[in-house]
Amino acid sequence: IGIVGRNGAGKTSLFKVLGGAAEPTFGSIVRKGDFGYLPQDPKIPGSRETLSAISHVLSGRQIDEQLTRIEKLRIQMEESSTAANIAKFSKAEDEFAMKGGYAAESEARAIAAGLGLKADRLALPLHVLSGGERRRVELARILFAGSDTLLLDEPTNHLDVDAKTWLLEFLRNYRGGLLVISHDLELLDEAITRVLHLDRPMEDSVGRIVEYRGTYSQYKTARAADEARLAKKAALQSKEIARLQTVVDRFGAKATKAAMAHSV
């Protein structure tokens, strides 16, 4: 689903509420399943700034914690190669492998690579990466998590042509729900099958949502037809109001003349 509307219509605010980053002014939100929310300017918690980029991606499925535990056991085993330490490390590694942990790590790296993040950059701590790289790392984490529903606000920002092509293919094949805000017309035409138009004339007014089925191009055609119909209706109403006002003015003038004649 593509979310469209003029600037200030409330698209980003709607996403914040749906994603749990903000509370609605009134009413309540009922969410089914889990949501993966990518804001325009994602904020990564300060406690994670020293972690590597790949660890942050893996945190989408909590795999980073398991890898950290295995790494600690490995260091412990190398420092003291007792039978107990070797057994602990082997057990943790076997459990991780049985749960598909290593395959999942390979999947996470493939997603990151698809978004244009090179392996050497993934090994660096988050705080040394550029803003564009950090946003791609966060997008990779959200895609890797495999949430029931994705909320993506301008997901193609900071992506080159190859990364955009990869993302489009990923979203086409995504099995969960997808809501997206984007100015990328190719994304809107290729990845969505419905459009929700946020119709909010003024920033302090209550808006409404109009649904259109089809791609963004089909929405544009249908929306133009709706606006033409509404403009024609408004013109007819204005014409009728003017006609009625003329009638009122005419009879008002006659009534005034009659009253003056009667007083004389």
Which role fits each region the language model picked out?
Residues 223-251, 261:
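Intracellular alpha-helical coupling/juxtamembrane segments of multi-pass membrane proteins
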Residues 8-9, 256-259:
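Residue-level detector of intrinsically disordered/flexible regions characterized by low predicted structural confidence
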Residues 41, 251-254:
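Generic structural signal for alpha-helix termini and adjacent loop/cap motifs
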Residues 134-135, 259-263:
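A short, terminal or domain-edge coil/loop segment
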Residues 1-235:
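ABC ATP-binding cassette signature C-motif
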Residues 98, 254-256:
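Short histidine/acidic/glycine/proline-rich micro-motifs that form metal-
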